[in-house]
Structures are given as C-alpha cells and as structure tokens.
Amino acid sequence: MRQKLFPRVERNLSVFGENLKAARLRRKLSMEQVAERAGLSRSTISAMERGSASVSIGSYLQFLFVLGLDEDILKMAADDILGRKLQDAELLSGRRAPKRKNRGRTA
C-alpha cells in the first residue's frame, strides 16, 4: 500500500526534485552520468527528479554527493527554533526530565 503524504510534504518533495534536476543540468551532467557515478539506475534518478517518496534517503544523498551538495543535508533541522523554544519553556517552568533508572550499573 502506498503511503499517503501530506500535501505540503508532496510539494516539498516535488520542489526538491526540481532543484536536483536544475543542479544536475547546471553541471551539464546527463541522468546516465549521475546514475553511473552514484551507483543508481537511471530510473531512480528520474524518480528523484520527480520528487518520489519511494526512493531511499540514502539514494538522495548519493545523488547530492555526485553534485557536490551532500553536506547541505546537514543544514536540515540544524537550527531547530521551535524545539529550542519548547526546551527553553520547559527550563523556565522548572520541570525536569524524569530520572533514568540505574539498571544495576555503578558509575
């Protein structure tokens, strides 16, 4: 059964695929060249450029690596503004995370 994605996620994947294609074309690389260098099939490259959700993140990273853009993935969620606000609010409220049980180990 195919996974149902949120519309925004589908749009983001589609834009991501378009960006991959544009980056490939700017480098004057064919799908076949990228596929060979990434160790993927041409049909997988085509699916990624269409923003397919069925392609593994590892394959997307291989594609990015061939384009010299693989480190850009590290920027994702690096500045988690909402998460930091939630963490700060928890610290201000004085609540602490529950203690972990010591499972017979000594420090």
PLM regions with names:
Residues 18, 28-30, 55:
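Residue-level signal for the short linker/turn that defines the boundary of a DNA-recognition helix
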